[in-house]
């Protein structure tokens, strides 16, 4: 299974490299950070994230929204991290938004606002079903 190396969006010098690939057997996007921390997102989770962001924001920009203290208290503003937190109520999982956003951008589902602060995206490929996600991830 081929891996892709990508970089988070942040202020110059603070960006982080990470590796990602799609595990077809488990139908899971696997992300490994510079610190060798793994984040895994199922196709159903990714579909839910894209659908929820489309419903909440339409074609408008949404924030990263992955502040650990605010996520833990459930007080983070609506955005990518908060959608992930609602899925599992797991701050570590939700903080992976910084990586997942870049992957979804590289796959053509999101557009980045070209800012290092505040980082944001918008949905540009709405209505993705599980089959379309699988095809996008397997045709890297």
Where are these regions (language model features)?
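Long Lys/Arg-rich low-complexity intrinsically disordered regions in nucleic-acid-associated proteins
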Residues: 66-69, 116
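Short helix-coil junctions and helix-kink-helix linkers
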Residues: 69-95
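Minor-groove-contacting beta-hairpin "wing" of winged helix-turn-helix DNA-binding domains
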Residues: 117-126
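Long, low-complexity, charged/polar intrinsically disordered regions in eukaryotic proteins
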Residues: 1-66
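Short, hydrophobic-biased segments on the C-terminal half of alpha helices
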Residues: 98-102
């Amino acid at each position: 299974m081929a891996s892709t190396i990508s970089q988070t969006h942040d202020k110059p010098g603070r960006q982080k490299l990470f590796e990602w690939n799609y595990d077809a057997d488990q139908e899971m996007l696997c992300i490994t950070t510079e610190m060798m921390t793994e984040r895994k997102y199922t196709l159903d989770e990714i579909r839910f994230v894209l659908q929820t962001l489309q419903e909440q924001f339409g074609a408008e920009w949404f924030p990263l929204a992955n502040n650990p203290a605010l996520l833990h208290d459930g007080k983070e503003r609506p955005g990518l991290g908060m959608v992930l937190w609602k899925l599992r109520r797991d701050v570590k999982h939700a903080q992976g938004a910084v990586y997942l956003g870049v992957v979804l951008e590289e796959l053509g589902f999101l557009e980045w606002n070209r800012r290092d602060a505040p980082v944001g995206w918008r949905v540009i490929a709405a209505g993705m079903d599980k089959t379309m996600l699988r095809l996008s991830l397997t045709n890297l």
